[in-house]
């Protein structure tokens, strides 16, 4: 039980510090948009951290957005060594996990589903108050 709390604290620290590092230190123009870290999962041995990111302003299914998201992941994965080094300076632990970035489609998928629901509701025929009784 104590180990899971430790992993959660480590994941929270990594998420907080990485968010700041990406915002302040990475100046690559290919990042484009606001990169947000939605979740971090640290392995039990703290050797790896799976970092899930979203990029605000990109819709699900758009081919151009998919290519831009892939490019963002490439930039982040190539900068993972630098980010890990900077992370080790900010978080004082014996082991700093290796970073692996993944695109988190949850937010974009939620927006997509919300749009479908709104469209379905608009397409419903309007019922008068007499029809409801």
From Swiss-Prot:
Monomer. Binds 30S ribosomal subunits, but not 50S ribosomal subunits or 70S ribosomes. GO terms for molecular function: ribosomal small subunit binding. Keywords: Cytoplasm, Ribosome biogenesis. This is Ribosome-binding factor A. GO terms for cellular component: cytosol. Belongs to the RbfA family. It comes from Acinetobacter baylyi (strain ATCC 33305 / BD413 / ADP1). It is found in: Cytoplasm.
